[in-house]
Amino acid sequence: MNICLIDETGAGDGALSVLAARWGLTHDADNPMALVMTSARLELRKRDEPKLGGIFVDFVEGAMAHRRKFGGGRGEAVAKAVGIKGSYLPQVVDATAGLGRDAFVLASVGCHVRMLERNPVVAALLDDGLARGYQDAEIGPWLRERLQLIHASSLTALEAITPRPDVVYLDPMFPHKQKSALVKKEMRVFQSLVGPDLDADGLLAPARRLAIKRVVVKRPDYAPPLGDVATPNAVVTKGHRFDIYTGTPA
C-alpha cells in the first residue's frame, strides 16, 4: 500500500523502514495521507487538511481512559449487545476493529477479544497503540491477556479462525451524518484512507457461521440492516442500534 512515510523522531535508527516493511507499506511522497512516526506514537495525518491533526490509537490516556474509568462498563450498549451477564464474559472476534474502541471496552470489562483489521495502515496504528498499552503498569497486565490483533481481511479470516468465538462483532464503515467534531475528523481521515466498506454485506453470513452464540452489528440509526437481513433483536441507543443475529451452535 502506498502512503507518505514521515519520521519525526530524529532518532535516525531506521525504525520507520522496519515498520513499513512489516506492514507492506511503500513511501509515496505525493500521497495526501501520511503515516508519521513521532517520538511518542504512530499517527495518521491528512496532509492537505493539517488542521484535522493526527489520528492515533491510545488505550492508556485520553478518551479511552475516560471511557474505561467513567463510562458505563458492563452497562454500555456494546457490552449488553454481546450478552455480558453475571459471570458470563463471551469470547469475541471484532471483525472490523478500526481504532479498537469497542474492542477495548469489551476487554476492559473482562472479555477476551481478537481484533481483525485488513487495512495495513490502520493495523499499524492499532499495533502501536497495543504495544504502548501492553507496557502500561495499570492496564498492561490485563490488556496483554485480553486484547489481540490479527492483521487479515474478515472476508477470508472469518472462515478460518480457531477457536470459534461466542460472539462476532461487526461495525462496518457507513457514511456518518453526525456533525460532532471527532466523528467528522476521524471519518474524513478514515474514509480518505480506506473508503466505505462496499463489501460489508458479505460479512454477515460467515460471521454467523463462525459465532457460536450471536453476531452483533453496530449500525447508525438511519442505516438499513446489514445485507438487508432484518432481525427483531437489537440494543438501541441514541444514534445507533446494535442488531443481534443468532450464530451457529458448536
UniProtKB/Swiss-Prot annotation:
Q: Hey, what's the signal peptide range on this chain? A: none
Is rRNA processing there in the keyword field? yes
Q: Which SUPFAM superfamilies match?
A: S-adenosyl-L-methionine-dependent methyltransferases (SSF53335)
Give any Pfam family that matches: SAM_MT
Task: List localization entries.
Answer: Cytoplasm
Where primarily located? cytoplasm
Which reaction equation describes what this protein catalyses? guanosine(1516) in 16S rRNA + S-adenosyl-L-methionine = N(2)-methylguanosine(1516) in 16S rRNA + S-adenosyl-L-homocysteine + H(+)
- Into which EC class is this enzyme placed? transferase
What the protein does comes down to:
Specifically methylates the guanosine in position 1516 of 16S rRNA.
Q: Which NCBIfam families match?
A: PRK10742.1
Recorded family membership? Belongs to the methyltransferase superfamily. RsmJ family.
Q: Which HAMAP family match?
A: 16SrRNA_methyltr_J
PANTHER family per the UniProt record, alphabetical: RIBOSOMAL RNA SMALL SUBUNIT METHYLTRANSFERASE J
Q: What is this protein called?
A: Ribosomal RNA small subunit methyltransferase J
Protein's organism: Cronobacter sakazakii (strain ATCC BAA-894) (Enterobacter sakazakii)
